[in-house]
Design a protein with these regions (language model features):
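Acidic, proline/glycine-rich low-complexity IDRs
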Residues: 1-214
């Protein structure tokens, strides 16, 4: 599954710039998620690495297997987002994406997504949507990112633990939705759409072939 992580992108070593901060976050990640399987290293100055952690998404109390990966950024939270004072939201965040295969395409997309708040002087929070002009990854017709928060216990604990310079760090899960689903959220509100996800047993792992629920 990790064959598309090509050297020098695939590396278990933490490079020198900002290594202390990145290493501290990685230690928290690995405490909850286990040892990482790979890292897509960011050679840039505003460093945002993407770690891949293997996971069986079937709960321990259930039978079967649903193997995939947790992709998690490391470095987005180094910069505060431009959160309006009246919003009362966290000013720092890291992004998480549940995927079947930890491909370089998806990991690079996730890293780019983590740069958007600083580049565009904006912010991401629970329920925010980011429409794109075209599907951001191959194999899907969906063009809009939707940010939610984790419902899986280890991922929630990461969010409860992370902090930078006294600021709590929010973990936002990445989802892709259809144009019609996007319009439903704008028309009926986020809660109505979340109810629709529950009714359709929305899969934890990103499925590019998922059909629109609207």
């Amino acid at each position: 599954m990790l064959s598309l992580f090509k050297k020098p992108l695939l590396n278990r070593e933490i490079p020198a710039p900002a290594s202390d901060f990145h290493a501290r976050r990685l230690a928290i990640y690995e405490r909850e998620l286990g040892e990482r399987d790979a890292t897509l290293l960011d050679p840039g100055y505003s460093r945002i690495d993407v770690h891949a952690f293997a996971r069986d998404f079937v709960p321990d109390c259930e039978e079967g297997s649903d193997e995939g990966y947790v992709l998690l950024t490391n470095g987005m939270s180094e910069q505060r987002m431009a959160v309006p004072p009246q919003a009362g939201a966290n000013r720092r965040a890291e992004l998480m994406w549940y995927v079947r295969e930890a491909t370089a395409e998806i990991s690079t997309t996730l890293r780019w997504l983590a740069t958007v708040p600083s580049i565009d002087d904006t912010w991401f929070g629970f329920g925010h949507r980011l429409p794109m002009p075209a599907p951001p990854v191959a194999g899907t017709d969906f063009k809009t990112f939707l940010f939610l928060t984790p419902i899986i216990a280890p991922d929630q604990r990461i969010a409860e633990t992370l902090a930078v310079a006294g600021d709590p760090v929010e973990i936002l899960t990445v989802n892709l939705i259809s144009d019609r689903e996007y319009e439903m959220i704008k028309r009926d509100g986020l809660d109505a759409f979340l109810d629709l996800l529950d009714e359709n047993d929305y899969p934890a792992i990103f499925d590019p072939a998922r059909k629109s629920y609207v």
